[in-house]
Amino acid sequence: MKLLVLLALLGTVSAHQLHEGTPEQEVPAEQGEEEPGEPEPPCPTESESFRMTVPGSGGHTYRYVFVNNCQTFWRARKLCARCYRGRLASIHNYSTNQRLRCTARARTNRGQVWIGGVTSRWFWRVSSRWIDHSPWNYSNWARGNPRCFWKTCVALCTASGQWRSVRCRARLPFICEY
Ligand SMILES: *[C@@H]1O[C@H](CO)[C@@H](O)[C@H](O)[C@H]1NC(C)=O
Ligand SMILES: *[C@@H]1O[C@H](CO)[C@@H](O)[C@H](O)[C@H]1NC(C)=O
């Protein structure tokens, strides 16, 4: 009888750990992700940010900042908003992907950078979206991606231009669009 109780408890604990402890699970819902008590990071300095302007169709101009300062995904997003009145970049075609990859490769030093996508799972269904709400109409996943137990964020590999699912708490350089 005691043994059964013990087994039941162990079962509960490991189920609990499985639920709470995996990397993707550390990420709370959407906006959150504040480390309590940690001050807001200062805006990137000029030396760690590189601005690029791309003329688009119909006279529209796209502006990007490549920030070589490693932040978690949600902090990067906040910095894009606070420091550039922008957002993490979304990518809608191959040519933009290439352009951003090349500049990110030259201007950042981690091999991967955050772009503005997140992947989440609802039971067996894994889906990705841009946090700026633009349509998810292009993707360039590396083989075996997206990977997602609960929620992951999208990183662009600066060597291949392919995208990988990364734990949102990882700290990476990032690309803002404004
Ligand atoms: C790719 O996307 C950018 C920005 O969304 C746009 O300005 C450009 O015209 C597109 N290029 C092609 C070849 O569709
Ligand atoms: C994808 O979405 C972007 C952003 O709204 C849009 O500019 C682009 O034309 C779309 N591309 C295709 C192929 O539908």
Whereabouts are the PLM-identified features?
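Conserved hydrophobic ligand-interaction patch in extracellular adhesion modules
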Residues: F73-T108, V113-I115
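N-terminal signal peptide
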Residues: A8-E24
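Extracellular disulfide-stabilized recognition modules
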Residues: P23-Y84
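Eukaryotic intrinsically disordered and solvent-exposed regulatory patches
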Residues: R75-A76, R99-C102, N140-A142, S160-R164
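Extracellular/periplasmic catalytic domains that process cell-envelope and extracellular macromolecules
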Residues: G56-G59, A106-N109, R121, G144-F149, ...
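Classical eukaryotic N-terminal signal peptides for Sec-dependent ER targeting/secretion
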Residues: M1-A8
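Short, structured beta-strand segments at or near domain termini in extracellular proteins/domains
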Residues: L7, C168-Y178
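Surface-exposed ligand-recognition segments of extracellular binding domains, strongest
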Residues: Q112-K151
